[in-house]
C-alpha cells in the first residue's frame, strides 16, 4: 500500500534563475498587461512623492504666512490643498488600476500553469505515478499554485512599487537635505543587515514547510485509499502515529518559518521608528537654526519621506519570505513541467481497412476490420498487416530498476484466439508482463512481437487502442454509467454501449439503477457494489472490441454469484480474441489454452490445466493449496 516518497527537490539552488523563469512565463502571455502595471505603478509612486514634496510648499508658503497675517485669506490655501488632493487621488486611482490588472494576470497565469501541468501530466509515463505520491502531486496543484497566486498578485507589484518608491524618495530626500539623508541611509543599512539574517533563517524553513505539506497530503491520500485495509488489519494506531510524525515535522518547519518571519516585520518597523525619531531631533535642530536654508516645511516633508522610505523597505522584507516560499512552489511546478514525457518512437499505426481485389486498403470510415500500417522508409512502400492478436515474447528481461531484474528470459507464444493464463505467488511477475504488453514499461532485453511486428515500432496509442484491459482496481469517473462504459470507445453509439453491457451481464443491474444508463456515478462509483463496478469495467473493455484482452485479477474482487454472471459474458467476449488472464482463483483459468506458472520472474511450468495437474509441480500445489 505504501508508495515511495519522491520529493521534487530539497531547495531552490538558484532563486534568481527560478524567478527569471517565472517572470518569463508570466510575460510570455501578459507582456502588455505587465507594461501597463509598470506605468500605473510609476504614476502612483510619482503622484504620492509629488504630493509629499508639495507639503514643504504648503507649509512654508501657505500655512506659515497665514499664521502671521492679521486678516488671513484661506482661498490660496484651499486651492493648494485641492492640488495636493489631486496628486493623492491620481495615486489612489493608479494603485487600484495596477492591482486590478495584476489580479487578472495572476489568475490567468495560474489557469495557464494548471493547463500546462495537466497537459504534461497526461504525457508522463506510468512510472512517474508509480514513484510519486498522489497527494504530493495534488499539493502542487493546490498549495504550490496558491503560493504563486499570492506572489504574482501581491508580492510582485508591491516589490516593484517599493523599489520605485525607494529610488524616488531617495532622490527627493537628497534634494531636501543631504545630512538627514545620510542618517536615514545608515539606519537603512542596519535594517537590511537584520532583515537579511532573519530572512535567511525563515527562507530555509519555508522550503522545508512546502515539502512537509506534500508529504502530509500524500499520506492522507494514501490512507483514504487504503482505509478498509487499515481497519481490517487494525492499523489505526500505527497510521495515527505515522501521521502525527509527519504532522509534527510540518508543525516544526512551519513554526520555525513563521517565527523568524514574524520577528522580521516588527524588528524592521521598530528600527524604522528609531530612524524617524533621530531624523526628527536632528532635523528640528537644523530647521530651527535655518542651516542651509532648511525650513519647517522641509522638515515635515522629509519626515514624511522618511516614513515613506522605511515603509517600502518593510514591505520588501515582508514580501521576501513570501517570494522565497513561492519560488519553492515554483520549483516544484517547473519540476513537473520539466519531467520527460513518455517517449514513443513508434511509426506503425492502426487503421481501418477494407478488402479490394484480395488486397487490404486503408479506409477513412469505420469498417470493423483493422490493420497495422507499416511504412518502409528504405523503399518508400507501405504494408498493411491485418490485426489478428498474435503475441510473442522472446527472451524478455525486465526490471523496474535496471540493476534489479524481476523478469528473466520470459518466452511466450500466443496465437490469435488463444487464452493464456498467468498464475503464481504474489510478486512473481504476473502483472508486470501485462505492463510490458501495452508498453507501460519497456523491456531491458529480448523482443515482444505483435502480429509479427516489434512492439517498439508500433505507436503506443495505437498499441493500447488494440487492447482491452480490465484492471484489478476498477476506476470509474464522475459521469453517467453510459459515459463510463463509452470510455473504452468514444465513437461507440448508445446501442454499442448497451450491447457491451449485455455481453458483460451488466445490463440487468444497470436498468435497475434510478436513472438506468444515465445514472450519475460519483467518488469512483462508490454508490455501486464492488461486483457491479467490476462488471462496468468489463463492459468498458467489451465496447472497445479489441483483438487482445488483458484481464488482471478480473474476478478476484467479485462474489461467487456475480462471478458466475461474469464468466458467461467473459467467455463470449473472449471468443476469437487473444486473452491474457491473471487470477488467484485458479478455477477461473481451468479452460485456458495454456497456463504459465511464474515464480521469481521466471516461467517454471507451462501447459494446459490437466497437463500441469498431472505434473504435480508448482501449479498442482497452488491449485490444491
Positions of the model-derived regions?
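Helix-loop-helix
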Residues: 65, 172-186, 256, 260-331, ...
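ABC-type nucleotide-binding domain
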Residues: 70-71, 353-625
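Juxtamembrane helix-loop junctions of ABC transporter transmembrane domains
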Residues: 8-16, 40, 47-60, 86-134, ...
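An intracellular "coupling" helix at the cytosolic face of ABC transporter transmembrane type-1 domains
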Residues: 28-31, 126-127, 145-152, 156, ...
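Helix-loop junctions and hydrophobic alpha-helical segments within the transmembrane domains
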Residues: 117, 121, 230, 333, ...
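Transmembrane helices of ABC transporter permease
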Residues: 29, 33-46, 84-87, 154-208, ...
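Membrane-integrated ABC transporters
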Residues: 1-48, 63-84, 98-102, 106, ...
Amino acid at each position: 500500500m505504501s508508495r515511495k516518497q519522491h520529493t521534487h527537490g530539497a531547495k531552490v539552488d538558484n532563486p534568481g534563475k527560478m524567478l527569471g523563469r517565472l517572470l518569463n512565463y508570466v510575460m510570455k502571455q501578459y507582456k502588455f498587461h505587465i507594461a501597463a502595471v509598470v506605468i500605473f505603478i510609476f504614476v502612483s509612486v510619482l503622484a504620492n512623492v509629488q504630493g509629499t514634496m508639495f507639503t514643504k510648499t504648503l507649509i512654508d508658503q501657505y500655512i506659515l504666512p497665514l499664521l502671521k497675517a492679521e486678516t488671513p485669506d484661506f482661498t490660496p490655501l484651499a486651492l493648494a490643498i485641492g492640488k495636493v488632493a489631486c496628486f493623492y487621488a491620481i495615486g489612489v486611482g493608479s494603485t487600484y488600476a495596477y492591482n486590478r490588472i495584476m489580479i487578472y494576470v495572476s489568475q490567468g497565469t495560474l489557469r495557464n500553469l494548471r493547463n500546462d501541468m495537466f497537459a504534461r501530466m497526461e504525457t508522463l509515463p506510468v512510472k512517474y505515478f508509480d514513484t510519486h505520491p498522489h497527494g504530493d502531486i495534488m499539493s502542487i496543484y493546490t498549495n504550490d499554485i496558491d503560493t504563486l497566486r499570492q506572489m504574482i498578485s501581491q508580492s510582485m507589484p508591491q516589490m516593484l512599487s517599493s523599489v520605485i518608491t525607494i529610488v524616488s524618495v531617495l532622490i527627493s530626500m537628497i534634494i531636501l537635505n543631504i545630512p538627514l539623508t545620510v542618517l536615514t541611509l545608515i539606519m537603512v543599512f542596519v535594517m537590511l543587515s537584520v532583515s537579511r539574517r532573519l530572512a535567511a533563517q525563515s527562507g530555509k524553513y519555508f522550503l522545508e514547510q512546502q515539502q512537509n505539506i506534500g508529504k502530509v497530503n500524500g499520506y492522507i491520500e494514501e490512507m483514504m485509499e487504503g482505509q478498509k485495509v487499515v481497519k481490517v488489519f487494525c492499523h489505526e494506531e500505527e497510521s495515527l502515529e505515522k501521521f502525527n510524525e509527519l504532522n509534527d515535522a510540518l508543525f516544526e518547519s512551519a513554526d520555525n518559518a513563521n517565527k523568524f518571519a514574524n520577528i522580521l516585520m516588527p524588528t524592521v518597523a521598530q528600527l524604522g521608528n528609531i530612524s524617524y525619531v533621530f531624523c526628527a531631533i536632528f532635523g528640528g535642530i537644523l530647521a530651527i537654526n535655518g542651516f542651509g536654508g532648511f525650513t519647517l516645511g522641509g522638515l515635515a516633508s522629509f519626515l514624511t519621506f522618511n516614513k515613506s522610505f522605511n515603509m517600502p523597505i518593510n514591505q520588501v522584507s515582508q514580501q521576501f519570505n513570501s517570494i522565497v516560499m513561492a519560488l519553492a512552489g515554483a520549483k516544484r511546478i517547473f519540476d513537473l513541467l520539466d519531467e520527460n514525457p513518455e517517449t514513443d518512437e513508434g511509426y506503425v499505426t492502426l487503421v481501418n481497412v477494407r478488402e479490394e481485389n484480395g488486397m487490404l486498403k486503408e479506409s477513412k470510415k469505420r469498417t470493423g476490420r483493422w490493420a497495422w500500417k507499416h511504412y518502409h522508409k528504405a523503399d518508400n512502400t507501405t504494408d498493411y498487416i491485418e490485426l489478428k492478436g498474435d503475441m510473442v515474447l522472446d527472451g524478455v528481461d525486465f526490471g523496474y530498476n535496471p540493476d534489479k531484474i524481476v523478469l528473466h528470459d520470459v518466452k511466450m507464444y500466443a496465437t490469435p484466439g488463444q487464452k493464456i493464463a498467468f498464475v503464481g505467488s504474489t510478486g512473481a511477475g504476473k502483472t508486470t508482463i501485462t505492463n510490458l504488453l501495452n508498453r507501460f514499461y519497456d523491456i531491458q532485453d529480448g523482443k515482444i512481437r505483435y502480429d509479427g511486428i516489434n512492439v517498439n515500432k508500433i505507436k503506443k496509442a495505437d498499441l493500447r487502442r488494440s487492447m482491452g484491459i480490465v484492471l484489478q482496481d476498477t476506476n470509474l469517473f464522475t459521469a453517467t454509467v453510459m459515459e463510463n462504459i463509452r470510455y473504452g470507445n468514444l465513437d461507440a453509439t448508445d446501442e454499442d454501449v448497451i450491447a457491451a453491457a449485455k455481453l458483460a451481464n451488466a445490463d440487468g443491474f444497470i436498468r435497475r439503477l434510478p436513472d438506468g444508463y444515465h445514472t450519475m456515478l460519483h467518488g469512483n462509483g462508490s454508490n455501486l457494489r464492488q461486483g457491479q463496478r467490476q462488471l462496468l469495467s468489463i463492459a468498458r473493455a467489451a465496447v472497445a472490441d479489441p483483438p487482445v484482452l488483458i484481464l488482471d485479477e478480473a474476478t478476484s474482487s467479485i462474489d461467487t454469484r456475480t462471478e458466475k454472471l461474469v464468466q458467461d459474458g467473459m467467455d463470449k467476449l473472449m471468443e476469437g480474441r487473444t486473452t491474457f488472464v491473471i487470477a488467484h482463483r485458479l478455477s477461473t483459468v481451468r479452460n485456458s489454452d495454456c497456463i504459465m506458472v511464474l515464480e521469481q520472474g521466471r516461467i517454471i511450468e507451462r501447459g494446459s490445466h490437466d497437463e500441469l495437474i498431472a505434473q504435480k509441480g508448482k501449479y498442482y500445489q497452488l491449485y490444491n493449496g
